[in-house]
């Protein structure tokens, strides 16, 4: 059963857009996220503490970008005490790029990845497809933050998320930016409030932090922190999804973009909720070097390899939180395509499976319909000739409890499936699907060693309800 409440129908205390699904206790409040609305199963993903990078301060401030939001943070500010030694970002590939995307790309190009000091983010309005006026609004936001930082050079990246085609209440935002700046802090609560401020239909704030060391400076403990938002319109191909990653490690601007591209390709570009690529997708990575040590300036150095490994693993953990908060989702699914002659083909196949509505609805219905998975493998575009050979292809389910893998198809031949066990496996929230290509036609089975992993969720009735009432 799904119960809908219109804005204002329950009085001022709940004057918000609420969609509640009793099947899993999910509650979706558009742009108004508070402790009382976070579903109990999702609370385990919210950190109670963290270790945050030196020299970064953050804040979450209430503006009221959407009129229904009368008290909760919807303006996030992330700022380094000193200009960052390096910054990079990966942006949406959608042709209708939002004004903040256009502006931030130009700013990074002008600064050549150096001297970026802040990121300002509003939720509640995407500032996308808003013409010259929207671009001017984004410029005004950046300029106001630069003014607070005491610099006349462009040093602020801008992000926005929310409804497409509407102008920002720019005066309200500009009036509150000085407040956001004065509220900057380095505490865990400040980081959590900032992560909350960028949420829209998210049911919980997505924030993680991690410490690491580098081979050249084993005595220094570095920190990496990141926040992201997204629950729908998620099929990035940087590629609504936003993310900011910050570290106090010393990184040269020349290697910043390759580090981020590698991490994003194996994390944020390897997730899917509904197959839609947003106009606003942006992942930014800032390094201020505040922890000291030797600067990472070469892509062949041990430090570079170490940071690349840490950053990629970190980005995967952060991006997976987006999938776990997929609109209406009841399952977190890992699809692993292995023994492919090349990585790109394996990734294309994994992406196609993750986007398939038939696969996603079968999983929601707890139906072990492996034919839909195989069908998606077979129609995948752009794979290398000979990658998919039916008589060498196998499909199986890997349970999360450590019990033996359930084989569904082996070398092109269907197995006699224990439907009761299959149904039991599909009762769990987490599931792994393994597609083994057997090396394609490059030799005997197993000689193709490339593997790609994608993370996605199922499609439920609630997904339709949430998006059918998105602007209502």
Swiss-Prot record:
Gene3D superfamilies: arginine biosynthesis bifunctional protein suprefamily, ArgJ beta chain, C-terminal domain, L-amino peptidase D-ALA esterase/amidase. It holds the Pfam family ArgJ. Signal peptide: none annotated. CDD domains: OAT (cd02152). Pathway: Amino-acid biosynthesis; L-arginine biosynthesis; L-ornithine and N-acetyl-L-glutamate from L-glutamate and N(2)-acetyl-L-ornithine (cyclic): step 1/1; Amino-acid biosynthesis; L-arginine biosynthesis; N(2)-acetyl-L-ornithine from L-glutamate: step 1/4. Catalyzes two activities which are involved in the cyclic version of arginine biosynthesis: the synthesis of acetylglutamate from glutamate and acetyl-CoA, and of ornithine by transacetylation between acetylornithine and glutamate. This is Arginine biosynthesis bifunctional protein ArgJ, mitochondrial. It comes from Talaromyces marneffei (strain ATCC 18224 / CBS 334.59 / QM 7333) (Penicillium marneffei).
């Amino acid at each position: 059963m799904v119960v809908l409440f219109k804005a204002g129908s329950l009085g001022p205390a709940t004057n918000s857009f609420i969609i509640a699904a009793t099947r899993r206790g999910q509650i979706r409040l558009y742009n108004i996220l508070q402790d009382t609305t976070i579903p109990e199963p999702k609370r385990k993903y919210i950190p109670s503490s963290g270790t945050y990078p030196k020299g970064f301060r953050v804040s979450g401030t209430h503006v009221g970008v959407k009129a229904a939001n009368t008290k909760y943070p919807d303006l996030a500010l992330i700022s380094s005490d000193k200009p960052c030694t390096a910054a990079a970002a990966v942006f949406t590939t959608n042709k209708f790029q939002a004004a903040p995307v256009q502006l931030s790309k130009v700013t990074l190009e002008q600064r050549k990845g150096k001297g970026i000091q802040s990121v300002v983010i509003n939720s509640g309005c995407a500032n996308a497809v808003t013409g010259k006026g929207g671009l001017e609004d984004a410029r005004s936001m950046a300029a106001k933050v630069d003014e607070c930082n005491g610099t006349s050079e462009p040093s602020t990246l801008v992000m926005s998320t929310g409804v497409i085609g509407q102008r920002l209440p720019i005066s309200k935002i500009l009036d509150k930016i000085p407040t956001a700046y004065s509220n900057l802090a380095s505490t865990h609560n400040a980081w959590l409030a900032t992560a909350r401020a960028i949420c829209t239909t998210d049911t919980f704030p997505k924030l993680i932090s991690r410490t690491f060391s580098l081979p050249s400076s084993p005595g220094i403990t570095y920190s990496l922190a990141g926040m992201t938002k997204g629950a729908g319109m998620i099929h990035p191909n940087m590629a609504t999804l936003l993310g900011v990653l910050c570290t106090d490690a010393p990184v040269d601007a020349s290697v910043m973009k390759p580090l981020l591209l590698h991490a994003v390709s194996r994390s944020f570009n390897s997730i899917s909720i509904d197959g839609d690529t947003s106009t606003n997708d942006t992942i930014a990575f800032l390094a201020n070097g505040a922890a000291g040590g030797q600067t990472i300036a070469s892509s062949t150095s041990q430090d570079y390899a170490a940071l690349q490994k840490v950053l990629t693993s970190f980005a995967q953990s952060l991006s997976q939180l987006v999938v776990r908060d997929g609109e209406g989702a009841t399952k977190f699914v890992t699809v692993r395509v292995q023994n492919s002659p090349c990585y790109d083909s394996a990734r294309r196949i994994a992406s196609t499976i993750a986007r398939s509505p038939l696969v996603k609805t079968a999983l929601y219905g707890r139906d072990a319909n492996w034919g839909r998975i195989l069908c998606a493998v077979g129609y995948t575009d752009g794979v290398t000739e000979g990658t998919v050979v039916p008589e060498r292809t196998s499909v199986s389910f890997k349970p999360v409890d450590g019990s033996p893998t359930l084989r569904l198809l082996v070398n092109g031949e269907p197995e006699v499936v224990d439907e009761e066990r299959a149904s039991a496996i599909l009762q769990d929230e987490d599931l792994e699907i393994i597609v083994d290509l057997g090396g394609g036609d490059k030799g005997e089975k197993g000689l193709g060693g490339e593997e790609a992993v994608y993370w996605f969720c199922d499609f439920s009735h609630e997904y339709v309800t949430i998006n059918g009432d998105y602007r209502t």
